[in-house]
Amino acid sequence: MLEPPKSYNEMLPMLHKATFITTFIFYLSLVIYGYMPLVGINAKYIPPIKDYEEFIKWILTFGILPIAFSIFWSVISGALDLHNNVAKIIGIRKVWDNYLIIKPLAKIAGVTRKLTNDESYKVMSKLYYPEIKELKDKHYVELFWNKVYYFWVFFEHTVIAFITVLLISLAKLTNLFSVTGSLNNLWLWVISLIAFNFLIFIASVKPRTESQVRQIPDDKI
């Protein structure tokens, strides 16, 4: 999980695993600091797993919720393509594609007008993706996925943290369950994650995307 992928297809399963781990740590912290109830489980329902029995017992001392929600969000990450769909909904993908890929390519081609949605789609599907796939120097591609992978890991964690904190806030306001921790600390964590994601994007993802675009030969554009 710590070694970055070299392609989008390599990234996906690694992203789902990373989401499981970051979510587990996050929900474990929520239970420890009084933001979520400790929901136990009867030991007879735990299957015997050789060499991991003590570890599993330790995990379940924090209740079933951290492991259950980690599995849930990991499945959501894969089944619903969480990072990609949320990025599209809030406009990150549109900004990323338009300003870091499509406009620079259009400028090289001498096109100054705004492209239509259909033209933008063709630039991405018929030019950018095929040409990047055919690049002989894979160094730029690998550097790109090195940075993008970590961006998506923290992006998915930010989405999950935001939804979770929102639900915990509603639970505290409606007395759905006992929340002893400060909501201010939770929202500060979410804001910090958003700021960190923005920093990763500006400092790493943006220059790597621009560098990759520059590798496309002018005569292909």
Kindly give the residue locations of the regions a language model identified.
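N-terminal signal-anchor module of multipass membrane proteins
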Residues: 182, 198, 218-221
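Membrane-embedded alpha-helices of multi-pass membrane proteins, especially ion channels
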Residues: 164-168, 196-201
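Loop-to-transmembrane boundary segments
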Residues: 9-23, 116-172
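N-terminal first transmembrane alpha-helix
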Residues: 1-105, 174-194, 203-215
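Charge-rich cytosolic interhelical loops and cytosolic tails of multi-pass membrane proteins
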Residues: 77-147
